Amino acid sequence: KGLIAACVIGDGEAETGPLATSWNINKFLNLETDGYVLPILHRNGYKISNPTIFGRMTEEELEDFFYGHGWKPYFVTATDTQKAHEEMAKTLDKIVKEINGLKGRATVDHEWPMLVLTTPKGWTGPKEIEEKQIEGSFRAHQVPITITRDNPMNLPLLEKWLKSYHPEELFDDKGRVKKEIRDLAPTPSKCMGKSE
C-alpha cells in the first residue's frame, strides 16, 4: 500500500503475449489497498532483427491504444542526453503528483498514468560501423560491434565506445565501485518500490 514501483518495458518485449496481456493489470488494482506500478514503455523501434509494432505507431495511435486499456500516457521523446534527463525529471514529477492524487480511490477509469519514452535504438553507441548504420537500426541490438581473433579491426572502436562512459570515474584501481558513487545510492526507505 502506498508504494510506487517503476517498471521499464522494451517495445519489443511489450508486444509479446504475456506482456501484451499485462496492459490490463490496472483493472485489478485498488489504490485503497494496493501500491502502484508505473509502466515505462521504452520505445526505440527495433527488436532483434525486426521493427516493433509500437515503434511504427504514431503518438496519437499510442495514446488511443493505451487509453483503450485504461492508461493515461505521458510522452518523452529524446535524442539529446541532457534534454532527456531534464524532460524525464519534469514528466516523472508530474506523474508522481498525479499518482499521489489517485491514492485512496477504489476505482480509477482511464486515469492510470504511464510513460512512453522514445529514444533511438543504440543511443550513445557508435552511429556507424563498417559503413553500416548502427544507431537507430536493428543492428544496435545485442552485439553491435563484431570482433573476432581473425578480424580484430573493430577493437579500437569498442574501446573508444566503452571509454566514453568514463569507467575511471566510477571504479577504483581494484575494479570496485568508488565510495563516492556508492554513497549516492538511496537509503533503504528511499529505494524504488519502497516509496510511501
Description of each model-found segment:
Residues 1-30:
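Cofactor-binding active-site loop characterized by glycine-rich and histidine/acidic residues
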Residues 13-17, 36-196:
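Conserved acidic/glycine
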Residues 29-32, 65:
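Short glycine/proline-enriched loop/turn "hinge" motifs that connect secondary-structure elements
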